[in-house]
């Protein structure tokens, strides 16, 4: 099956492109002229991705056009004029606390799906990933970064906090103390440090980034879908289970997989 682009007005308005190729999907941030900044329309487009993926999709690559992965929130939203056709933050924050929390919840939905579903998500990050861009990269299961990649949680420097699930995802990757230091200082983390901290799974030259990420996707697809899905579920929830509960979950997951493997061996003999 050849790769094709999904036609969607919602995605186009948000500056997002979705490409499908059999068991693979590629989500592309496609507003390089705005440094792939996140507007309300971009969040809406990203939140819609799960409903646009056919059931045969097993891996999802998240990448960006241009020299920068994502500059974070589109700062035009902070001005009275805002982004054309969208509510400004001035208007949004004029509402009551519940309405503002609901708005934030909608943004969080855009970043929740990469880890929550059975598919494996891979983020390919080049250049800067700032604020929401950093948190989008963190939402993926695996990160491949270019040698020029750099990350920063800029929110605290602006007097706000990372609120797109990044505090938890970062803590799970690098631990409490390091996550707090990265967030509280808003400093930059380069590709080499990201690799050392476990933020990045692989580093590649910028011109080889997409190919390296696609190779990783292919390596996932080379293994049986049921086993990959089961192991993601086990690893994803391991930190929330005690050893006995995790052992029980492994036993339950293994039974149907073991039977299927043995049947396959028997069928080949």
Task: List PLM regions with ranges.
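C-terminal alpha-helix plus adjacent terminal tail
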Residues: 1-22, 53, 186-191, 207, ...
């Amino acid at each position: 099956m050849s790769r094709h682009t999904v036609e969607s007005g919602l995605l186009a308005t948000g500056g997002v492109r979705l490409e499908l190729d059999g068991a693979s999907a590629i989500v592309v941030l496609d507003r390089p002229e705005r440094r792939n900044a996140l507007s309300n329309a971009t969040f809406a487009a990203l939140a819609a991705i799960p409903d646009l993926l056919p059931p045969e999709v097993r891996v999802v690559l998240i990448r960006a056009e241009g020299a920068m992965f994502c500059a974070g929130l589109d700062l035009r939203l902070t001005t009275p004029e805002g982004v054309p056709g969208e509510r400004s933050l001035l208007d949004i924050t004029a509402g009551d606390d519940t309405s503002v929390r609901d708005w934030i919840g909608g943004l969080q939905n855009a970043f929740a799906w990469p880890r929550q579903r059975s598919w494996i998500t891979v983020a390919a990050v080049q250049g800067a990933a700032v604020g929401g861009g950093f948190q989008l990269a963190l939402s993926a299961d695996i990160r491949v970064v270019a040698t020029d990649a750099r990350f920063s949680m800029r929110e605290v420097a602006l007097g706000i906090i990372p609120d797109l699930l990044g505090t938890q995802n970062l803590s799970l990757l690098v631990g409490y103390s390091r996550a707090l230091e990265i967030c509280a200082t808003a400093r930059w983390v380069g590709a080499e440090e990201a690799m050392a901290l476990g933020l990045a799974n692989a580093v590649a030259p910028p011109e080889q980034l997409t190919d390296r990420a696609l190779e990783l996707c292919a390596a996932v697809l080379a293994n049986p879908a049921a086993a990959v899905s089961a192991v993601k579920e086990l690893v994803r929830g391991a930190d929330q289970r005690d050893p006995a509960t995790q052992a029980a979950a492994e036993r339950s997951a293994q039974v149907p997989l073991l039977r299927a493997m043995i049947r396959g061996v028997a069928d080949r003999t």
